[in-house]
Amino acid sequence: VWPFRRKVRASSGRLTRLLVILAVILALCAAGFFLLPAGRALFEDTRDKLGKPVPITPVTTTATTESARHPATNTTDGVRNSYWGTSPGASVTYTFRTPFRLVDVIITNGAGFTPKEYATQGRALEMDLEVTTSSGEKKTKKITLADKAGTHTIVTAFSDVKTVRLTLNSPAGLTQGRQLALAEVEFFKRS
């Protein structure tokens, strides 16, 4: 019967089929190449969420300015009612022994954890978080904090972190005789 027994020439459509297959393979390779960074970020983000954050303590804490009674080391002493006293625009740098994946930063802003302690000094409502990797690359994140006592958890996703610098901006409650205060900064790495 005619429609079912057509004569087909040899190699009919083989070249077209081959070109289509090669085009599909090339498109898949290109998509894989261009989507690899997004896939890697998604993979790392998933690992961050599935793992339990573990606290990590810096080996050194240095500041651009500090008062004698309220040094920058008060931000990592584990006590939330002591603080680093400084002026607007000052920064504190935390250096770590080995590079790690920074997952979270918990900031206790102001002079302390309770509302009464919090209101005794000025506090920063904005901070610049600058991370330096072991290769020297710098990454920055702008942080906005609520003007209230307690902790503020900042979710980060920085790999290969060696140092962290916090710069205090946008002071609130800073009047005559008061300092800009930062009570505690806690760092968490991926487990």
Q: Which residues does each predicted region cover?
A:
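Intrinsically disordered, low-complexity terminal tails and linkers
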Residues: 23-29
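Beta-strand-enriched, solvent-exposed domains that form extended recognition/catalytic surfaces
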Residues: 79, 103-106, 138
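Beta-strand residues in well-ordered beta-sheet regions across diverse protein folds
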Residues: 95, 106-108, 167
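Exposed beta-strand and adjacent loop surfaces of beta-rich binding modules
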Residues: 91, 102, 124-128
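Extended extracellular/luminal ectodomain segments enriched in beta-structured repeat modules
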Residues: 89, 97-106, 161
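Disordered, acidic Ser/Thr/Pro-rich linker "stalks" and the adjacent N-terminal cap
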Residues: 1-18, 29-97, 115-119, 188
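A short beta-strand element within beta-rich, extracytoplasmic domains
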Residues: 101-119
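Trp- and acidic/polar-enriched beta-sheet ligand-binding modules for extracellular glycan
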Residues: 21, 113-191
